[in-house]
Amino acid sequence: MLGFEAAGTVDAAGPGVTGTSPGDSVTALLLSLGGYAEYAVASTWTGKPESVSWLDAAALPSSAEAAVRVLRQLNVISGETLLLFGGGGSVGIIATQLAVARGITVISAVSEHDEALARELGATPVRYGPGVAGRVGALGAVDAVFDAAGKGVLADAIALAGAPKRVITLSDPAAADFGVTLSEAEPDRAPGALDETMALLADGKLQLRAHQTMPMQQAAEAHRQLETGAVHERIILTLP
């Protein structure tokens, strides 16, 4: 069953589970899927404060976990420059804000549609597409590259970062051919990621990608819309 993430109310807690109890509001990362349902089994979750909407809570887990995980793996520190491909996506938006808050300079390769947003979040936008390496190089040296787009940018990424070890991709299947790490979600690979980002969201210090809603019964239509590539917002499926 599809569904990497979901938000809802705890129905029951398994043996030995601590930190939550029936009736609690939570959002969960579902690495074994199952979010497209009324009930799901979760092992990675965080509480939902009252100040956070259900829609924002549902939109947080997978993107937040990925952003935190890759930034930790890259070990980018204050004063360094991070090049981010896919800065206008749900992962990129969170990664930009986390990096900027840590004193990291972010160059965000985005479409024309997302340039203003990247700038608003504290990044320097560059137009994605042919010639992007030259446009980035004109801004100065790059210390690390976070590829959240997975669209054939690894050769440019390595040239800009200076070595494959400072490049990580979330989804480019050619990663091994370039000696680049393909980062995948696994239990406990980014401990505390949901707690950290939920706290920022509750404090108004984290912005998420814009989203729209559709009823669960229209899940197939939601996927058809996403496959067109023309949807600039996340689609959140809701249950009555």
Predicted regions span which residues?
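Short, well-ordered loop/turn sites that connect or cap secondary structure elements
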Residues: 20-21, 76, 161
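C-terminal capping/lid region of NAD(P)-dependent oxidoreductase domains
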Residues: 205-209, 223-240
